[in-house]
Swiss-Prot record:
Cellular compartments per GO CC: plasma membrane
Entry keyword Manganese: yes
Native source organism of the sequence: Methanoculleus marisnigri (strain ATCC 35101 / DSM 1498 / JR1)
Subcellular location: Cell membrane
Keywords, comma-separated and alphabetical: Cell membrane, Ion transport, Manganese, Membrane, Transmembrane, Transmembrane helix, Transport
Protein name as catalogued: Putative manganese efflux pump MntP
Gene symbol of the encoding locus: mntP
InterPro entries according to UniProt: Mntp/YtaF (IPR003810), Put_MntP (IPR022929)
Family note: Belongs to the MntP (TC 9.B.29) family.
GO molecular function terms noted in the UniProt entry: manganese ion transmembrane transporter activity
Function: Probably functions as a manganese efflux pump.
Main location per the UniProt record: membrane
Amino acid sequence: MDLVTTLLIAVGLAMDAFAVSISGGATLREERLRWAVIAGALFGGFQAGMPVLGWLGGMGLASFVGTYGPWIAFLLLALIGGKMIAEAVRGDGESVRFENGATVLLLLAVATSIDALAVGVSFAVLDTAIALPAITIGVVTFAFSAAGVLLGSAFGHIMGRKACIVGGIILVGIGLRILLEHLFF
């Protein structure tokens, strides 16, 4: 998988964490930089680790999937992206108060990284190495989450839902690209 595609996947996956970080950052009045680093580390760490777990689990499935891999990758990415878009349109909770502590952030990091687990399965099915994508996803998510906390503390809830919609569109688009490449190239 090329670097541009990997970066787009990373950005798409980071949008949930970005939206949560904006929302949480909007509640902060003190220690903004501290919370930005904590949120970035937790969200980035889980977003990097989950694709590896998905990839390890998906490697066992890859031999059974064969030529259906691109279809599975498309379906997973389209479902994940569609879910992100639907939740953003409905306004389902991405709201959190960081003042409740790091435990809340840990739970949110796990919850927002479940999508990355499914992406890891897609990488395995496509027989794609996982190290570079996992590192890229983690670094991008760290940066987006830290920036989200700082933006949220400065601008409030203006961007939260829009970020999830953009992330969902990116993931659906990547899934469609994988499928079209399989069908026509």
